[in-house]
């Protein structure tokens, strides 16, 4: 087995209190890795602390974790990528095990499933939201991950270089998960410790705002990845409403030969037309998506797997 080049990517914004310890922990766990801190418009001393700890600091001016991930995946070239947050909550000591799993099993992604060592590490709202989103992904895509929103992941080069990274914020973890599910990539999960933030470090994740954005991302990707099912559901609902409205009119017409409520009849007809249009739209878009998925699969296969 040849020596693999490893890049550790740590997105950061105002993590002066934690980034130094994070870099030091990953340096101890992966002494041969190159550690990058991608600063996202920090207003504190994050950059200087990261440099002092031995990290290479890059800057992404556009706010949002998704923008940082997009930039880092485009700029960094390595055989194996380790991504974690710079807030010292993830267990750096688990990284060698995750990398070994990726290489030996020839996987494209290993997810660090968070197991909190203290109740304060996982806020109740985040835990509930994670469970709901994980359940939605499982129902929509047929399979899912135990921790969809985990920010601790190890990737192969072909995953990183085939990932479009369209998200801008914290919904990027959801996009990463759906990318793996959509292309049926070989993946695995490893339970890792999840720690409380150091004093002075505060979470940038809003339970409701970012949860809503993640939910919209799932629905958008559902529409894009499964258009036949998405528009089929809409068409079915419209068709059922149309039939419910039309049945009393049909009964009255059969008895009297008259249509007593013309606007209602027009509404029923319009809804049925929309139902058919929705079905046909789903069929057309499904053909387009199959073509796009084939191109993405070919782009993925053009890159060498972990060795």
For each predicted feature, which ranges?
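Short aromatic/hydrophobic "clamp" motif used to bind/position activated sugar donors
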Residues: 81
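Acceptor/aglycone-binding surface of glycosyltransferases and processive sugar-polymer synthases
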Residues: 61-75, 92-170, 174, 195-212, ...
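Hydrophobic helical membrane-anchoring modules
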Residues: 1-2, 167, 172-307
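A conserved acidic beta->alpha catalytic loop
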Residues: 39-47, 88
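Cell-envelope/extracellular polymer assembly enzymes that use nucleotide-activated donors
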Residues: 5-7, 34, 175
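Donor nucleotide-sugar binding loop of glycosyltransferases
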Residues: 15-18, 42, 65, 91
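Short, well-formed alpha-helical segments that are part of the catalytic scaffolds
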Residues: 14-28
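Conserved donor nucleotide-binding strand/loop of the catalytic core
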Residues: 34-36, 47-75
């Amino acid at each position: 087995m040849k020596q693999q080049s490893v890049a550790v990517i740590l997105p950061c914004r105002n993590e002066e209190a934690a980034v130094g310890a994070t870099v030091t922990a990953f340096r101890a766990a992966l002494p041969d890795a190159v550690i990058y801190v991608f600063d996202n418009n920090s207003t504190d001393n994050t950059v200087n602390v990261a440099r002092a700890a031995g990290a290479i600091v890059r800057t992404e001016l556009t706010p949002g974790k998704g923008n940082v991930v997009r930039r880092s995946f485009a700029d960094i070239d390595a055989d194996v990528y380790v991504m974690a947050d710079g807030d010292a909550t993830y267990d750096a000591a688990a990284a060698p095990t995750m990398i070994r799993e990726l290489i030996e099993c020839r996987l494209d992604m290993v997810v660090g499933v968070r197991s909190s060592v203290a109740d304060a590490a996982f806020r109740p709202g985040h835990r509930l939201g994670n469970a709901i989103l994980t359940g939605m992904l499982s129902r929509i895509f047929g399979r899912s991950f135990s921790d969809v929103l985990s920010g601790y992941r190890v990737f192969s080069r072909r995953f990183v270089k085939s990932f479009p990274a369209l998200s801008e914020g914290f919904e990027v973890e959801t996009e990463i998960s759906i990318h793996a599910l959509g292309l049926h990539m070989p993946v695995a999960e490893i339970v890792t410790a999840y720690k409380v933030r150091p004093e002075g470090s505060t979470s940038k994740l809003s339970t409701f705002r970012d949860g809503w954005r993640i939910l919209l991302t799932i629905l958008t990707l559902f529409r894009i990845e499964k258009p036949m099912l998405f528009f089929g559901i809409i068409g079915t609902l419209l068709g059922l409403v149309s039939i419910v409205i039309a049945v009393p009119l049909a009964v009255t017409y059969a008895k009297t030969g008259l249509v007593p409520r013309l606007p209602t009849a027009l509404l029923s007809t319009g809804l049925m037309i929309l139902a058919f249009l929705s079905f046909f739209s789903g069929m057309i878009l499904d053909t387009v998506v199959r073509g796009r998925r084939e191109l993405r699969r070919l782009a993925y296969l053009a890159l060498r797997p972990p060795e």
